[in-house]
């Protein structure tokens, strides 16, 4: 692996690690309004990344199909969505709002919370992996800066995600060090998923458009299933989640256009 590839793959994990370290500098549990802001920002980044870094390149790479160039993006998107839906049903986990999902289990609540975030980090790792694969294969629609832009965007949105995991664990009585470790571990799956996807894409170059849209479908599933409900939680109406959705969306858009 070359240096740029390693940096691109590890940046999102660094974002999660730094976010998890908030347990050492923040005293209290995250307020509802703060969680709305963080969830909205993360959702905005993921939606923009799904469109500019994944779906549009998937369609561009299929342009030889003419009017049917939408088919790989359409099919991959649905497969990615259904894949995350399946994982949600078969893996026991607890959402940030303490709602349990998946089969009954004796696992601790903290373990199921980390499982939930780990589960939803898989498509982010795949997204980084598939754009890196496109860059390494000298794909015209994706270059090194485009892959780096996606990686930076996901790293930025992983910072609040790391805090969203570690802070509630600390507030439930877990030591700061253990809460930090658990938050960090939730992000380990991202570089692992990225490396696996890079290797798989090397064998499956003809289906790269399907892999790009697969990652997009999986990421947008997470946005709708997890982040949008969180940015609108509570009985008091607030537009903060929506405003920071726009902030995250435009930031990722600028990153992709400026660097890609």
Question: Model-found features: residue ranges?
Answer:
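Intrinsically disordered, metal-sensing/regulatory segments
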Residues: 1-260
């Amino acid at each position: 692996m070359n240096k740029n590839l390693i940096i691109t793959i590890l940046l999102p994990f660094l974002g999660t690690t730094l976010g998890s370290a908030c347990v050492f500098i923040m005293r209290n549990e995250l307020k509802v309004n703060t969680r709305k802001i963080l969830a909205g920002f993360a959702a905005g980044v993921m939606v923009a990344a799904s469109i500019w870094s994944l779906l549009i390149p998937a369609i561009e790479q299929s342009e030889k199909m003419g009017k049917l160039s939408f088919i790989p993006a359409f099919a991959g998107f649905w497969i990615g969505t259904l894949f995350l839906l399946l994982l949600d049903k078969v893996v026991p986990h607890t959402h940030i709002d303490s709602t349990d999902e998946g089969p009954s289990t004796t696992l601790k609540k903290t373990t199921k919370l980390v499982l939930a975030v780990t589960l939803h980090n898989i498509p982010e790792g795949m997204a980084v992996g598939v754009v890196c694969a496109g860059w390494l294969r000298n794909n015209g629609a994706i270059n090194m800066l485009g892959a780096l832009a996606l990686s930076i965007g996901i790293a930025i949105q992983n910072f609040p995600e790391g805090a969203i995991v570690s802070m509630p664990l600390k507030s439930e009585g877990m030591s700061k060090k253990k809460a930090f470790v658990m938050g960090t571990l939730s992000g380990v799956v991202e570089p692992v998923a990225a490396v696996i996807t890079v290797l798989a894409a090397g064998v499956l170059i003809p289906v790269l458009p399907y892999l790009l849209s697969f990652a997009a479908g999986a990421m947008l599933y997470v946005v709708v299933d997890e982040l949008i409900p969180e940015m609108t939680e509570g009985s008091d109406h607030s537009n903060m989640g929506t405003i920071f959705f726009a902030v995250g969306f435009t930031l990722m858009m600028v990153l992709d256009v400026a660097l890609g």
